[in-house]
């Protein structure tokens, strides 16, 4: 794979203009360009009123070795693709299904990866599913009546669901986790430009659908969700979690992905 950086085009421009610029930068014929993927897009406004987009693009071409041998300048380089790899499985048999506490970003992605690997996770969420949660949030804005467990902080999708779905990217993530997260969001309905724009965000309306589709995929893979299920105690000797003060759920392995607002759960764990 070849990476081309500092590719500047005026705004607006077409896809065809970007491809022509790539071909010129690489000194190849159009038919030698097999495919390309935008990795980064940033705005250059230093020469106002002129505005430019500056791109970093990963390219597949014919005769890559020959091109790299004769390349000129530092804006064309060779890179190795590093897709995210799930850590190796353990050697001991898992006692029961894994239980995940919380269905914010950490909990959802934990459940998604475990479900893909065949572990059929159970997700416990103190709030409501994202559809009911949206209704509760709308009701709060209209009436001022707060549902303490289903609001902008608690419920499926986590606190970011109602903050426009802004994303922070880990530029130096060598394990490909950041790319995996963004590609997963795109898979479930987010706009493809979150993969490369400088300040990506999904948008609350779209994120609600993305979260719902992630849940549906986890369910399809054998996972389970239990909403309005607050973990109220950790019963270590019994290998159980107490839910809503009464119910006991077996949990040989439990992942607490409770975000920053579940202060009562922090106190219970302490």
Residue ranges with predicted function:
Residues 1-53, 57-270:
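Residues forming the flavin
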